[in-house]
Amino acid sequence: MQAIILAAGMGTRLRSVSPSKPLTLVAGRALLHRILDNLRAAGVTRPLVITGYRGDEVAAVAHAAGAETLHNPRWDQPNGVSVLAAAPRLEAQALLLMADHLASPGVYRTVAAAGRPDAGLVLGIDRRMGHPWADEADVTRVSTRAGRIAAIGKTLNTYDAHDCGVFLVTPELTAALAPLTAPGLSDGVRALAARRRAAVVDISAHDWIDIDDPRALALAEAWVG
């Protein structure tokens, strides 16, 4: 299984404690290294890290953990641009994840096993509303219907799940992003959802956290010990 890890952005909300989210130390180990360790534990053998801001340093961590890298020179653009940078290397199916989301191997295994011929992507969702690790003011909200994404975004008023930041994707996603100008990943997800090609899989039995600010970093460090 291939995994594409988006690690190009600047991550301004953690700048007070770290110069770069992927390089942030979580209990003494770089966040990106922990993500790659958990991917390996889940059986992922072909990780590809998309670098950008502080790319040489991020690439050094990725290479030390056994991953390949690809630099996105437009790293200051929305994250859909990093997905498009990976398009020439994208396999028929791949995990797609964010370098600021730390997930247990069970999350990756569950999403990797959720492929279906009637979907161009599958998003891992968490239905544990009110979980203390979730930042309700910032988490991406998902409204689902019959196992598919009906709506997705940070400002939804009606929703029944959180986006855990881990997808199983196919080239349908990059095809949806390609015509757009400086797209975000969610733009591609919405395009597939409009065609009923965006499915979901429940990962609520497994833990994950979006390490987006000092509070979340403290929670993550307590989790990994």
Language model region names:
Residues 10, 19, 54, 204-207:
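A generic "binding-loop/recognition-motif" signal
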Residues 13, 57-60, 79, 106, ...:
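Phosphate- and divalent-cation-binding pockets in alpha/beta enzyme and binding domains
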Residues 22, 66-68, 148, 197-199:
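Conserved beta-strand segments of alpha/beta enzyme cores
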Residues 99-102:
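The conserved acidic donor/metal-binding loop of glycosyltransferases
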